[in-house]
């Protein structure tokens, strides 16, 4: 394996390579790859976001962040269907992300929740044939981030036109990328057969719908609660529910990692913010994220970017308080939602004699 190939590896694999290296030279190469990979990703992310916000106005920054995450993922992870149906799935994603912010303009909350549920369910069904590959978490985050980041007053005809152009351009780019990287995979796997004929009642598909319903409920709830950053609670909720229902990760372990990671991240931010400007702390967090391979440490350094933005609005004590409270709230809501859902599923199965 040469140096360029090592830069393409995940941090978890790179750390394995470092431990298993047969020589100091090989170990040094993998260590350099780990840190340079993180640096290149951060630099590319900064350039990527600057270009998009320059060409399409700064209001499109949430879309720039999401499109960057999609680009990083699509290079390595497909949607699990034959290429023509994967491109259809990509179109569903782009359309849903275009429409999602405008749902908040609907006056009737129940109708808004129903539309969010349909859009998010469609995204999950189209991209997460194998939820363990992480697409459910990525696109669930993307949906939440865009919906929460775009207030009503930013939504107008000009914004819609620009967003449509932006998403169409990236739809074309990502379609080419999907074709080049994944056209030989899953040649006989149909999106429509998988959803409507084979697996509609599978446990994974049921949990996709459960997850989409919970997220939709939480999005609509923001209209009725006084919290400043309900988006953070939404991310914590999403992480707990998606990891449990779609990736078979124990919610207790994920909840502990989320809360401890948030607490450590906030403490570190308080200390570092005494010496480093907020903007640089966000970049530092991005660099650290690039070398993390566990959820807990990713949660720690995710705090840096989020707090760097919020601290400029509420001050460091206020931002830290909101961050801790919202994460604990999201984790508690996620655990409660899983508990209630499990009880309902068990009762339904008992009623229909499906315990076996």
Predicted ranges, named:
Residues 1-139, 143-296, 300-304, 309-356:
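Alpha-helical transmembrane segments and their membrane-interface boundaries
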